[in-house]
């Protein structure tokens, strides 16, 4: 699987890592992907609306595609800091544009001094089984807004812990 696929395509729960990120971004956000050259064409075909290996990366938050990201985790990424978990560099933020040719060196530099952040990530395919129950719970929050919505005042909920109301 991993030879012809990017780590962000791994499905751990309802969504793949890239789907999970895309669901939590705004339409005004720019998504630029840095992928291995040997899978660049495949990824461009699969994701024609995304910017794959551009010559220049815009300032912003850089997320490792192996991470299981939610909006609260993304909000932890602060200006000009880098973050690692037990699998290595997982995220950083940059205020500057970065050339494609310089990005790998820049990431290595960011990895040398980083803060620890508690983000699950998938290093090996079998890691999915360790985090599957958590990602399913996390993904259900993306699908449903539990008990959010307008109910008629005459409506009475019985066993409301077992009821999902979605907008």
For the regions a protein language model found, what residue spans apply to each?
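Terminal amphipathic alpha-helical/low-complexity segments used for targeting or macromolecular assembly
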Residues: 1-159
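Hydrophobic face of beta-strands forming the core of extended beta-sheets/solenoids
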Residues: 151, 165-166
């Amino acid at each position: 699987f991993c030879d012809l696929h990017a780590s962000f395509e791994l499905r751990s729960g309802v969504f793949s890592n890239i789907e999970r990120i895309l669901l939590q971004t705004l339409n005004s956000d720019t998504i630029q992907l840095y992928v291995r050259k040997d899978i660049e064409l495949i990824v461009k075909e699969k994701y024609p609306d995304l910017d794959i290996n551009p010559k220049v990366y815009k300032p912003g938050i850089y997320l490792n595609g192996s991470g299981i990201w939610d909006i609260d985790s993304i909000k932890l990424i602060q200006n000009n800091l880098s973050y690692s978990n037990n699998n290595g560099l997982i995220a950083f933020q940059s205020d500057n544009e970065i050339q494609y040719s310089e990005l790998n060196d820049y990431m290595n530099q960011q990895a040398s001094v980083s803060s620890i952040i508690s983000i699950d990530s998938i290093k090996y395919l079998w890691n999915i089984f360790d985090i599957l129950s958590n990602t399913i719970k996390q993904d259900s929050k993306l699908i449903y807004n539990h008990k959010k919505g307008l109910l008629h005042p005459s409506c009475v909920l019985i066993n409301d812990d077992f009821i999902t109301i979605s907008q």
